[in-house]
Amino acid sequence: MLRFTNCSCKTFVKSSYKLNIRRMNSSFRTETDAFGEIHVPADKYWGAQTQRSFQNFKIGGARERMPLPLVHAFGVLKKSAAIVNESLGGLDPKISKAIQQAADEVASGKLDDHFPLVVFQTGSGTQSNMNANEVISNRAIEILGGKIGSKQVHPNNHCNQSQSSNDTFPTVMHIAASLQIQNELIPELTNLKNALEAKSKEFDHIVKIGRTHLQDATPLTLGQEFSGYVQQVENGIQRVAHSLKTLSFLAQGGTAVGTGLNTKPGFDVKIAEQISKETGLKFQTAPNKFEALAAHDAIVECSGALNTLACSLFKIAQDIRYLGSGPRCGYHELMLPENEPGSSIMPGKVNPTQNEALTQVCVQVMGNNAAITFAGSQGQFELNVFKPVMIANLLNSIRLITDAAYSFRVHCVEGIKANEPRIHELLTKSLMLVTALNPKIGYDAASKVAKNAHKKGITLKESALELGVLTEKEFDEWVVPEHMLGPK
């Protein structure tokens, strides 16, 4: 039994309570909103609404926090809004400058630790919009020498002026996705394409057997095979780049339902121009704000482009993986870089790990696309309320493909070597070289040559001579793999 000595239980509890209150007062401050007072960590810039969301939506923990590119996009948006509101006479220049400075810090990532909210919150993203408003508000107050929480710079009246969560969140969705695609994804895909193109040129002289249906087919060069991969990546780049066009249309200025209530005429055009200036990308106001709030077809389209790209990258990684299979009992036409041990039980085994990592990324992107597609269909009346999960999955896809493209290029593609002896061995064994005889002896006779060779385990030449369909000289003149690489 717990016993208290030299003091009563009541006195002990009372003194402990006072101690805890003193500790709480030193590490927390009190913020207020329409629901009343709430304690907020003293070292954080966020306010009451962020704190309530933080307490009410403990789903997934830190790993499900709102993506930082979106947070940084909020900084761009809030700075742009302050500039435009000031220019239209709606915001005091002194307050505007403080908001701009604070928003710059958000955009640069300096205040990342002050954005704790997770993706799984209200479907409009209201709480993350208020997180940005509150952080910028309190940081601006601090810049002006005021007391944090005093609302000298108000999160709603000033930081959210001429705005609604319903138009700010879709706007930062587009800004974040566009910046990540333009500055991260496309450059890395271009690097991968260039690496594959270099291999295509390096391997252009190597004639190998083609395969269709996983069966032997007619010859091509290894360079031609790789040229197909180059084109797939180039097509993927073009598809993703095309999605930037629809992402360039911004919902900002639509406010609550698309009517533009509480904005001044021209606000929507001016803020798109200012965001363009801040980011270096071309943005424009959406021609129809009702569509921009209620539907996110541009996000679905962009995800679709990424999904197609994932299909392409899966095929490329899988082909290279198969062509590198072996080393003694597989195709082994390619020799892949050996980066790390491959087995905990089989000594000396090395696996195509980069290919496997890339294909797993592709599967994840396909899954993300499924989530985005369903969420994109869920715009009821004037608002889609699946915004956070849509942008979280889209940014995840962009990040994964960007990183995987780099890893696959550096640790696999650039180090691929052709196993020319093995390639030549398989080429000369192929029965499908018989296709060169079609124009000379006809399809039926050529088919008999191939089947006879396969049945008896002899070469095509031996089979053709045995069947008497041509002479040795004719065979040597007509069946030349190097002459079977294009129209003739």
UniProtKB/Swiss-Prot annotation:
What InterPro entries does the record point to?
Answer: Fum_hydII, Fumarase/histidase_N, Fumarase_C_C, Fumarate_lyase_CS, Fumarate_lyase_fam, Fumarate_lyase_N, L-Aspartase-like
- Which residues are recorded as binding substrate? 124-126, 154-157, 164-166, 212, 344, 349-351
Reaction(s) the record says it catalyses:
(S)-malate = fumarate + H2O
So, what pathway does this thing act in?
Carbohydrate metabolism; tricarboxylic acid cycle; (S)-malate from fumarate: step 1/1
Keywords for this entry?
A: Cytoplasm, DNA damage, DNA repair, Lyase, Mitochondrion, Nucleus, Phosphoprotein, Transit peptide, Tricarboxylic acid cycle
**Pfam families in the record:** FumaraseC_C, Lyase_1
Residue positions of the PTM Phosphothreonine? T428
Please state the protein's primary subcellular location: mitochondrion
Group of enzyme by EC:
lyase
Could you name the active-site residues?
H213, S343
The record's statement on gene disruption is: Cells accumulate extracellular fumarate.
Going by the entry's taxonomy, the superkingdom of the source organism is recorded as Eukaryota
Record localization: Mitochondrion matrix; Cytoplasm; Nucleus
Q: Does the keyword ATP-binding apply?
A: no
Per the record, what is one GO cellular component? mitochondrial matrix
Q: What does this protein do?
A: Catalyzes the reversible stereospecific interconversion of fumarate to L-malate. In mitochondrion, catalyzes the hydration of fumarate to L-malate in the tricarboxylic acid (TCA) cycle to facilitate a transition step in the production of energy in the form of NADH. In cytoplasm and nucleus, involved in DNA repair in response to DNA damage: following DNA double-strand breaks (DSBs), translocates from the cytosol to the nucleus and promotes DNA repair by catalyzing the dehydration of L-malate to fumarate.
Give the note: Present with 6920 molecules/cell in log phase SD medium.
- List the protein's name: Fumarate hydratase, mitochondrial
